[in-house]
């Protein structure tokens, strides 16, 4: 049995949807490595350092969580951490096609690595970092979309 898993993402910023997936993954594994991606292809609102800081604050009450950044292939990071399970969230059918392709791509790079897909709870299904960023651009209230621990930081 696997005792740890990686939950990768840009987390720009972390949302209640992300936190929901993390909390439920904690019920399945002894340790979850939340891997904050330094993706050069994405223009982020928050720096890598800030995203790591926000994730650490948002998950500080969860003892099974370790937050790290990475800037390599996810499969290489998983090997480095001796982790065979990747966790991904699926909000809608539109997420499924992309996530399935990525899961297969990762599997083709390392046949030992499996991807587990979790759906967020219904109340979090519409939340995305993109929605949060759009609201933030117009100084809107995002307090119901993000973890309480980071409200003051945004």
From Swiss-Prot:
InterPro entries: Cyt_trans-like, PPAT, Rossmann-like_a/b/a_fold. It is found in: Cytoplasm. Keywords: ATP-binding, Coenzyme A biosynthesis, Cytoplasm, Magnesium, Nucleotide-binding, Nucleotidyltransferase, Transferase. GO terms for molecular function: ATP binding; pantetheine-phosphate adenylyltransferase activity. It comes from the Bacteria. It is an enzyme of class 2 (transferase). One of its GO terms (biological process) is coenzyme A biosynthetic process. Pathway: Cofactor biosynthesis; coenzyme A biosynthesis; CoA from (R)-pantothenate: step 4/5. Its EC number is 2.7.7.3. GO terms for cellular component: cytoplasm. The record marks 18 as: Transition state stabilizer. Substrate binds at residues 10, 42, 74, 88. ATP binds at residues 10-11, 18, 89-91, 99, 124-130. Signal peptide: none annotated. Its cofactor is Mg(2+). It catalyses: (R)-4'-phosphopantetheine + ATP + H(+) = 3'-dephospho-CoA + diphosphate. Homohexamer. Reversibly transfers an adenylyl group from ATP to 4'-phosphopantetheine, yielding dephospho-CoA (dPCoA) and pyrophosphate. Belongs to the bacterial CoaD family. NCBIfam families: coaD_prev_kdtB, cyt_tran_rel. This is Phosphopantetheine adenylyltransferase.
């Amino acid at each position: 049995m696997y005792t740890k898993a990686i939950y990768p993402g840009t987390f720009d910023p972390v949302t209640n949807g992300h936190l929901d997936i993390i909390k439920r993954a904690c019920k399945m594994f002894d340790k979850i490595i939340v891997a904050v991606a330094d993706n050069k292809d994405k223009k982020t609102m928050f720096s890598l350092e800030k995203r790591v800081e926000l994730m650490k604050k948002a998950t500080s009450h969860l003892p099974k969580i370790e937050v790290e950044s990475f800037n390599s292939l996810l499969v290489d990071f998983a090997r480095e951490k001796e982790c065979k399970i990747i966790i991904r969230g699926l909000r809608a059918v539109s997420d499924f096609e992309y996530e399935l392709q990525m899961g297969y791509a990762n599997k083709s790079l390392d046949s030992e690595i499996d991807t587990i897909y979790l759906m967020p709870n219904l109340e979090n299904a519409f939340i995305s970092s993109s929605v949060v960023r759009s609201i933030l651009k117009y100084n809107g209230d995002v307090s119901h979309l993000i973890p309480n621990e980071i409200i003051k930081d945004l």
